[in-house]
C-alpha cells in the first residue's frame, strides 16, 4: 500500500479514539491531515454536516469522499488496505 494523501481526520486533543486511530496511521506509515475541531470552526461544521448535525470523532474522510466515524482499528485498516 502506498502512502495515502488526501486523508483528513477530524479530531480533538482529548479524544482517546483519535489517538488510537493516529497510531494505526503511524504503524502503516500512512500520511494524513489532522484537523482539531475544537480550534477550527469550519472543520467542526464539516464534521457536523457529515453526521446529521451530531459530530463524533474521529471522523476520517478519504479522497473518494467516503468516511468513517469512530472506526475500530480493524475497520480503519480494512479501509486503508482497500485504497
Kindly give the residue locations of the regions a language model identified.
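Local sequence-structure signature of Cys/Sec-based thiol-disulfide redox active-site neighborhoods
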Residues: 1-28
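Short alpha-helical
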Residues: 16, 42, 75
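Class I S-adenosyl-L-methionine
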Residues: 19-22, 26, 48, 77, ...
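Non-catalytic, surface beta->alpha helical segment in thiol-disulfide oxidoreductase systems
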Residues: 62-83
